[in-house]
Amino acid sequence: MTSLVVALCTTGASAQAAPQPLVADSGIAAAAVQLPPVPAVLDYQLGAAYTPPAGVTLVTRDSTATPAPGIYNICYVNGFQTQPEEHDLWLNQRKDLLVTGSNGKPIIDPEWPDEFILDTSTAAKRTRLAAIADEAITRCSQRGFKGLEIDNLDSYSRSKGKLTVDHNLAYAKLLQQRAHALGLAIGQKNSAEVSRRARNEVGFDFAFAEECFAYEECGDYSDVYGALVMDVEYTDNLPKGPFSTVCRSSDRPATTTLRDRQLVGPNNGAYRYDHC
C-alpha cells in the first residue's frame, strides 16, 4: 500500500512556503494545479476516513473516499501494484499486465502478499496501464481532491529483475500528464534515492514519504522538493526514541505526522495520531 511546467525551486524551503498554481508542460491541455500547503498539519487516513482532528490542514484519503471539507486533500492511488480487492480481475482479465516469474506466476510484493506488481516494461503496456489508472485518477478529480499520492514507485526493486527504474519513471510520466491535465498535483512515493530524476524527468510536484526519518531518507527528498515533503512515521518503528525526538530533529520534514501502522479510525483502540 504504495501517483508540470513551471519548475519548482528545489534549493530551499522558503521559496515553497505557499501553494501556487502551475501549468503543465506536456502536450495535454492542463488545468491549474494547486500545491499542498507547507508546512502543514497532516492526517493520514487510508485505513478509515473520519473527521480530521482540530488543526489539521492536509489529509490523505483513498481514491474510494470523499475529501474532508475545508482543507487540502490528497488522493491515494496504488499506481504500480494492484489493490487486494481487484485480485481476481487482474488474474482473469489483465494477467499479461502483471510481472511474472520464471514459473509463469505473477510476482507479489512480499510485504503486501495480496498485491501484484504491474508490468511497466514496454511502452505499449505502460499506455494500457495508464488508461486503467485513469479511472482512479479521474475519480479523485471529480470528487474534489487537489493532489495525488501515487504509491509504489519502487516496485521495480521487488520485480526480480524484470523491471528497472527507467520503466517506472516512464510510466509515472504518463500518470503525471493525466494528473496535471485534471488540475491535480502529483507526489512521488518511495525510491528516495532517485528523487532528482523523479522530479526532473517525471515532474512530480511534491514527495510523500513513509518513515523517511526512521530510515534516514528525508534529506534525499528535501534536497529536491524543499519544504514540499510530507512524512508519516509509525508508532511501531521509532528507532531513535519517542516521537518528540523526531519533532526536535532538524532532519525531519516540516510536515511530519505519527500514526498507528494500520491507520485505523479514532473509534479503534489501536488508533494513534500526533504531529510535529
What name fits each language-model region?
Residues M1-Q20:
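Secretory targeting and sorting signals
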Residues L22-C276:
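Glycan-processing catalytic domains of CAZymes
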